[in-house]
């Protein structure tokens, strides 16, 4: 009997990073600068709020907050 752990939905306060493969195939990637900073793909960023299918993410750097589609974000798991 194989049981899978259900995926936790992302919510306010979740630590995340951007999945580069999913982002590169998105319509948002076509409309944005192709030279994005590495820190968004490495994480962690913190979700400040969610509206419909978008999340506002704050990075631990002195940069503006950014909105990403929820399906482009993955939960950040700190490695020990």
Swiss-Prot record:
It is an enzyme of class 7 (translocase). This is NAD(P)H-quinone oxidoreductase subunit O. It comes from Prochlorococcus marinus (strain MIT 9515). Belongs to the complex I NdhO subunit family. Its main location: membrane. NDH-1 shuttles electrons from an unknown electron donor, via FMN and iron-sulfur (Fe-S) centers, to quinones in the respiratory and/or the photosynthetic chain. The immediate electron acceptor for the enzyme in this species is believed to be plastoquinone. Couples the redox reaction to proton translocation, and thus conserves the redox energy in a proton gradient. Cyanobacterial NDH-1 also plays a role in inorganic carbon-concentration. Keywords: Membrane, NAD, NADP, Plastoquinone, Quinone, Thylakoid, Translocase, Transport. One of its GO terms (molecular function) is oxidoreductase activity, acting on NAD(P)H, quinone or similar compound as acceptor. It catalyses: a plastoquinone + NADH + (n+1) H(+)(in) = a plastoquinol + NAD(+) + n H(+)(out); a plastoquinone + NADPH + (n+1) H(+)(in) = a plastoquinol + NADP(+) + n H(+)(out). It is a peripheral membrane protein.
């Amino acid at each position: 009997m194989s049981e899978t752990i259900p995926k936790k939905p992302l919510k306010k306060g979740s630590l995340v990073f951007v999945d580069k493969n999913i982002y590169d195939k998105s319509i948002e990637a076509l409309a944005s600068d192709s030279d994005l900073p590495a820190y968004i793909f490495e994480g962690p960023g913190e979700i400040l709020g969610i509206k419909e299918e978008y999340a506002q993410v704050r990075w631990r750097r002195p940069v503006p907050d950014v909105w990403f589609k929820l399906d482009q974000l993955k939960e950040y798991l700190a490695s020990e």
